Amino acid sequence: REVLHTQGEAGLKRVVKKEHADGSVTQSQFDAVGRLRAQTDAAGRTTEYSPDVVTGLITRITTPDGRASAFYYNHHSQLTSATGPDGLEMRRKYDESGRLIQETAPDGDIIRYRYDNPHSDLPCATEDATGSRKTMTWSRYGQLLSFTDCSGYVTRYDHDRFGQMTAVHREEGLSQYRAYDSRGQLIAVKDTQGHETRYEYNAAGDLTTVIAPDGSRNGTQYDAWGKAICTTQGGLTRSMEYDAAGRVIRLTSENGSHTTFRYDVLDLLIQETGFDGRTQRYHHDLTGKLIRSEDEGLVTHWHYDEADRLTHRTVNGETAERWQ
């Protein structure tokens, strides 16, 4: 059970404190006009947000370790640059109509966008710093009709009156086709070799059967809440059971063996017992990150930096893997 504490009235009412089912607490702070200024997680670490006083757009985010990201906008509230905690900057330029015309990635790569229609926001071409050019054509409804890559290879696309893609035609004459029912659900795909895969649905729109080109059928059955309870593939059937919270608690394989799952009050997986009887356990910190897992005689610890980024893991005290 969660308990929410609010402040403010009417449109300025905000959740400022949340007591979670495990007893942990997270908090949020807002300014006088209801804009988020800070969030404190269950471990007591605070992330600060600095909104522009006029537009409300976020101009700066400072994480608990003091690292900051900055965001800059033009007078149309479009993002023009962003600088990450590492100091690398992303930049964007726009034309008089507010359309993106150039984007510079943090690594310095530049992409330019060209437009041939003053009334369209869809580019007709993109060009990178090496001069490689890709072109696109669009329908008046914004559907992609053709794409030409930097080598001149052309791919064309067909759509139905509802905007759904019905065919892809490649330059060498190979085509792929798609068909839909009256509800817009995909019911058939024919590949470039002419092989067709068909799809069937129940009244709720859930995919129930996939019929392969060779006629083999894979099926799925659902409960009244739309959760898959049984799947059949290649003549082999597997079933799933759920608890009252909708979490998978038991899987039964085609040979009748079982895998069971247990969760904590925050819906985090804490134990998995396989069909062979082997049990794996998982432990999380206050913010929900996996910090320890146990698999028979193996104990794995997961380590993070102050920005919650995974840095390394150890197995039985020995470093097994590192990330940078």
Q: Language-model segments: which ranges?
A:
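Beta-strand elements of repeat-based all-beta scaffolds
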Residues: 1-20, 24-41, 45-63, 67-84, ...
